[in-house]
């Protein structure tokens, strides 16, 4: 039998990082076994489900390169099928109509609280004759859960997990308005979709026990279950926004590459020996649900940064350039950069990529490191650069300006010879002239090599930027060293 997995998100928000990992595990296992992964949108909560959320989920999957087979399946659109199965269970004596009033249910809950017990429905309509049912109550349908013994969930990750049946009670499968509960709809859909393997978070383990009861009541085969550990923050607590609980779209906007995020997520709860960096082909070849760990994984943003930095360094220059341009419209200040990216600056940006990617962990860092290319003149110096262009720094810069202006050829070799010759004649270390020059050219003390920057910007732009600082910075220091 071919393996069929499913990713079944609720469209009440974005595709969060935990959901992305669940989708990845389902996708990898389907690919590993030559099977299929289906997408089911669990949109029965009509008040909270939105089309925007559905789009965000699908966009997130596409961005991560996680394709699904066939069209997305709407759980809401299958409500009639869910109702039919619930009524069939009643006919088969496996479920029953419950006419308990809201007041009765409130009394059951209150009595349980008073006695220190968990609130459980007491089964009062389990064997009662419905001909005596009150006319003013619309019934729900409840499953006839086993009252003795235990329900065992056979799980490929967690092992056999046992649930005393006395703790599960006769839960509702169809509400009084005819709509199915989540517990019931999931079972019917998994059966009808031919799902063979359910891979999801271990917060669904209790649900698995109740769903097992429904599968057994219908006489259906129970899919193989694999409940994967949740992702915790670096502090070991439940993942919060502060520690990484963001949507996939947020990581895209933060400049992470989909290949890097896949590589990072696959190792949260699963591993293949000491292998840390894996191609997608390796992941498909190696992934198996039997190798998933039981313990919660911890989200480490520094580790993600390191992996993303590796993928950036290994990326094709043109692909990286295109990816950087693509996120400009989504990041702060990106639209202003796009307005200034004329043909010349685009060419300069692309030319700088080989150098920039060596010092960037994200696309946003890469764009920021390239900001000297598209910034407006005169450049605004950051605080560290300002400290270098004091009176002494400006004096050095003035002589550098004159030396560069006289440089016969504007290439790395000629520029190197010109500046190093000047440093030697003045008995200066090269760094003492390179840093003021870097500050004038880029507004910062960190950038690609100063000769690379000079060549990238060209003679006119480089000299103009140096002159800008001689004029503006010198005048701000109340000197007359302007050229």
From Swiss-Prot:
GO molecular function: ATP binding; glutamate-tRNA ligase activity; tRNA binding; zinc ion binding
GO CC, any one term: cytosol
Top-level EC class: ligase
Reactions catalysed: tRNA(Glu) + L-glutamate + ATP = L-glutamyl-tRNA(Glu) + AMP + diphosphate
Binding site for ATP: 241
SUPFAM superfamilies, alphabetized: An anticodon-binding domain of class I aminoacyl-tRNA synthetases (SSF48163), Nucleotidylyl transferase (SSF52374)
Record-listed E.C. numbers: 6.1.1.17
One Pfam assignment: Anticodon_2
Family of this protein: Belongs to the class-I aminoacyl-tRNA synthetase family. Glutamate--tRNA ligase type 1 subfamily.
UniProt xrefs under PANTHER family: GLUTAMATE--TRNA LIGASE, GLUTAMATE--TRNA LIGASE, MITOCHONDRIAL-RELATED
Listed name of the protein: Glutamate--tRNA ligase 1
Source organism (scientific name): Bartonella henselae (strain ATCC 49882 / DSM 28221 / CCUG 30454 / Houston 1) (Rochalimaea henselae)
Gene that produces this protein: gltX1
